[in-house]
Amino acid sequence: MSKIIAINAGSSSLKFQLFEMPSETVLTKGLVERIGLEDSIFTITVDGEKQKEITNIPDHAVAVNMLLKKLTENGIVKSLDEIGGIGHRVVHGGEKFADSVLITDEVLADIEELSDLAPLHNPANVVGIKAFQEVLPNVPAVAVFDTAFHQTMPESAFLYSLPYEYYEKFGIRKYGFHGTSHKYVTERAAELLGRPLESLSLLSCHLGNGASIAAVEGGKSIDTSMGFTPLAGVTMGTRSGNIDPALIPYIMEKTGQTVEEVVSVLNKKSGMLGLTGYSSDLRDIIAKEEEGDHRAKVALDVFVSRIHKYIGSYTARMKGVDAIIFTAGVGENSAIIRERVLEGLEYMGVYFDAKRNNVFGEEAFINFPHSPVKIIVIPTDEEVMIARDVLRLGNIG
């Protein structure tokens, strides 16, 4: 048995989960927030109880030291020697990484170089990797990329209709995101269906504050809704999803905003927040719709209609689907959104059962038994995928 830590480092946060592998038992998990501020928050679960501490954590290295100290102090590990591997979520692997990889100096340099493609995320991921290297330099560390799963997309899916030299010179193409989540739920769907993954055509709907749809054929991603960045695709909590690109200079002209300001609006003030004017949270918006709020209704209609566009086109691409999967915060917990997405899809063999659909955050088939297309709710588990890859690549036993 080996203990493996899965790490997700943000610019001012560090999310962690410690597994006993290969049993996949979660020993503890937690979150360090507001790193760099005087009132940083450190939360860890010990024996099922959440412990919370507000203290000054100036940087990620201090956060890592504090985390490791808490593991030994609470007897979760007897000594740090028990930690056999570390897995780091890295948002962007570009075309360089089609799989998770053992971190070397060269790999770390490549990840830093790819920061151009993910300026908000990759630098933070690198900081997390370096912080652990300082404290546990001899423990195998693995980078698990959000983009890697989508590297199987054909050129017809990943190329934009732009001058080809933009792709050759600047790497401008669709990359796709949420890959670790889409990989986990499609592999789990094959297990639940009792069929080989290689024989299945699956639609994976990762619906959270960020949302993406993936077409997965034979276990390989053949298309996905996010693009060069996670701004593309369906309408999201605060992100616009696809818009006419000519709108950007038009908005600049009308508002006097810079490119950076307009892109910030598209990322942080658009989507459901932009449409409603008051919230990016679907629970708030559904409650407002029930009170008769017109903009809430319109926002929900837009959200669902954009998802339908991808379901329709990806079903055509795969010449039919075996199952539709719902995952992530909204996909796992909102029966109302699932119902609206599934309504009217009988033409493609989708028959959902409203009673079975009444599930929240647990695995369930929500289709009628006679439905040719199965509908499955699967809570995602990106952390366990990270731990599995550390076990696979880290030569840990």
Curated annotation (Swiss-Prot):
Involved pathway(s): Metabolic intermediate biosynthesis; acetyl-CoA biosynthesis; acetyl-CoA from acetate: step 1/2
Cofactor binding description: Mg(2+). Can also accept Mn(2+).
Record keyword Signal present: no
List of catalytic residues: 146 (proton donor/acceptor)
Chain coiled-coil ranges: none
UniProt-listed CDD domains: ASKHA_NBD_AcK_PK
Binding site for substrate: 89
Ligand binding (ATP): 15, 206-210, 281-283, 329-333
EC number per UniProt: 2.7.2.1
Main location: cytoplasm
PANTHER family listed in its UniProt record: ACETATE KINASE (PTHR21060), ACETATE KINASE-RELATED (PTHR21060:SF15)
Family: Belongs to the acetokinase family.
Protein name: Acetate kinase
Organism annotation: Bacillus anthracis
Lineage, uppermost ranks: Bacteria, Bacillati, Bacillota, Bacilli, Bacillales
Designated gene of the protein: ackA
